[in-house]
Amino acid sequence: VWSDEKGHYAVLSQTLFYPESGGQPADRGVLRGPFGEVQVLHAYEEEKAFGDVVHVLSAPIPEGVEVEGEIDWPRRFRHMQRHTARHLLSQALLRAGGYHTVAVSLDSPVCTVDLEEEAEEAGVLEAEALANFAVYADYPVEAFYVSEEELARYPLRRPPKVRGKVRLVRIGDFDLAA
């Protein structure tokens, strides 16, 4: 637990708050304890702190107290849906016109997908139809981990940015991504 001129922070022994990562915005919510309730405004993973999740708080909390966290579930669920939709759309764009996704924004009211090249209208319409087909097919979403050595066996859209154990997400037989 610490504070500086920019804000108040806490690293917990366990957390369900998702840190901003992989194009998905961080969770928000509250921490409750003997001090009352404080807002969790943001969460991020701190590599210098061995991958701990840092919770950015609206007010300081005492060190060493037990807390209970509650995430803003409607926000989290919306981001989960958008993130999965982004996987479907990126794969559909790749299949429809060879369009490669380079960046996404999921946090605003309007989500955006940036492509390496400009997409033609026919390619976008085909991608939309493919993505809708995947939604209606109700493919299962499965997450699993593989070692770096095992990665070569999986046909990924792009190489992962992480090393060591890599988390893969498979959406039926439609998409597989790190």
How does the language model describe each region?
Residues 1-178:
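Active-/binding-site microenvironments in catalytic and ligand-binding cores
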